[in-house]
């Protein structure tokens, strides 16, 4: 009888694997690494091992789900959702919440905000003393006053016991109730409550930890609170009392604080929100109230505005050399219309005497000279009242007076000045008539110009220069060039160039005698009196200028002839040369 031939590797393998499996099962309790060896050698694990591994994975998943569920209950729901969040969403919101808490300072974290050596009562006393107000806590739901400090008696004259437990809206002005309700209604946490889709119940997460502040919960607003002397009752919105009486009945309070949330068991006010099981934490306004000072407006119809101003400059003889563009809106003249004209042509005749005194004072002093109110003629012939501040400008290099700066301020307009002239009486009316009679109308000259007014400034400049020569050194010490420089500076310019660049010329002995005679003639001239000066004296001053220029030119020509060999050089040893 023949048996079938057995192939190698087919029948022997099951026997070998069965043998190894029995051995592995027997050695499992003793050798924990047998399962790895059996897996590597291709031996399948028994059902007991697979069951133990499944139980271990289940416990791990249950623990992770419990931790995620606990984490989701600790995160405040920013947006209430109808479905349950998955694990990834819970972890993402947890990360966002931790990032938002990272920027919070220790000032808002409760007990860590105060030093360890200060007690709570001492800290509250220092805060109230430094704030100069009163601390109060108001519920955001109904406006009930939970707490108010004793300092309210000093600020609003209320007793602490009379305010605690009352409604804040009963003490406010009727027009401020809506504004305060708006400030209390904007809470940092949402009003909606999330609902579970499976159980159809509202999530009731226990309140754990101290209340924290959130961004956007700060409040700062004003409201009017009734005074203690007025009985607490509702007033009609449309009251006929004046603002002054309203100020006596109400005090303006500046409120600054934060919205905070507390559990009902901590506050002890379960009835404030209805006392339901699903009611959330109580939101309150913790604020500091300061009395805002009330300023009673003055009973005046005038509006304080900056007066209209413009700046002008005029030379020593009173002729304009610069006019500000703002003068056009006040006077009506363009700047180029005033340049080169004398300021006395526009002054009222009654003001000439006072303005000439100020003109002399500003030429002899370096201080600012304030003029009285005077009348200035505008382009249409009317007058405006101005007040000016004059001061002279001296060139720091040449030490010579270049011009006078005038800062002009408008006091009265055209209509006011006309009324003031009418109220002055007959004397002013007669002076006005004489002023109109003295005015001339010449082509090329501004209308209403006073006869001889253009030479008043030139006469004043000549008079001041003569006084300065008398008060200075003796006439023998002065050189002829100084005489010419002083006379030419009266008109605000020079005939042959700037005074600082002119050199003294050599003159002959005969010409020196002529200069001495001219100087003695000028020194013996009498001073001109105040007021409108005649035209002869002004013409005399200009004649002297012309004579001095002629003598100067003659000396210059004599010097050129001597240099070119055309004439006798003469003797120059007796001439005093200015260095």
Curated annotation (Swiss-Prot):
Matches recorded under SUPFAM superfamilies: HLH, helix-loop-helix DNA-binding domain, PYP-like sensor domain (PAS domain)
InterPro entries named among the record's database cross-references: bHLH_dom, Circadian_TF, HLH_DNA-bd_sf, Nuc_translocat, PAS, PAS-like_dom_sf, PAS_fold
Short sequence motif Nuclear localization signal: positions: 4-9
Record cross-link Glycyl lysine isopeptide (Lys-Gly) (interchain with G-Cter in SUMO2 and SUMO3), residues: 226
Pfam families: HLH, PAS, PAS_11
Biased composition (Basic and acidic residues): 50-59, 186-196
Segments carrying motif Nuclear export signal 1: 118-128
Coiled coil: none
Residues annotated as domain PAS: 119-190, 296-366
Induction: Constitutively expressed in the SCN. Little change throughout day under dark/light cycle.
Sequence motif Nuclear export signal 2, residues: 331-339
Compartments, as annotated in UniProt: Nucleus
Tissue: Expressed in the suprachiasmatic nucleus (SCN).
Subcellular location, principal: nucleus
UniProt signal peptide: none
Domain PAC as annotated: residue spans: 371-414
Glycyl lysine isopeptide (Lys-Gly) (interchain with G-Cter in SUMO2) crosslink site(s): 233
PROSITE patterns for the chain: BHLH (PS50888), PAS (PS50112)
Entry annotated with the keyword Nuclease: no
Gene3D superfamilies per the UniProt record, alphabetical: Helix-loop-helix DNA-binding domain (4.10.280.10), PAS domain (3.30.450.20)
Keywords, in A-Z order: Activator, Biological rhythms, DNA-binding, Isopeptide bond, Nucleus, Repeat, Transcription, Transcription regulation, Ubl conjugation
Protein's job: Transcriptional activator which forms a core component of the circadian clock. The circadian clock, an internal time-keeping system, regulates various physiological processes through the generation of approximately 24 hour circadian rhythms in gene expression, which are translated into rhythms in metabolism and behavior. It is derived from the Latin roots 'circa' (about) and 'diem' (day) and acts as an important regulator of a wide array of physiological functions including metabolism, sleep, body temperature, blood pressure, endocrine, immune, cardiovascular, and renal function.
Subunit structure of this chain's protein: Component of the circadian core oscillator, which includes the CRY proteins, CLOCK, or NPAS2, BMAL1 or BMAL2, CSNK1D and/or CSNK1E, TIMELESS and the PER proteins. Interacts directly with CLOCK to form the BMAL2-CLOCK transactivator. Can form heterodimers or homodimers which interact directly with CLOCK to form the transcription activator. Interacts with NPAS2 and HIF1A. Interacts with PER2.
Descriptive protein name: Basic helix-loop-helix ARNT-like protein 2
Organism: Mus musculus (Mouse)
Species lineage: Eukaryota, Metazoa, Chordata, Craniata, Vertebrata
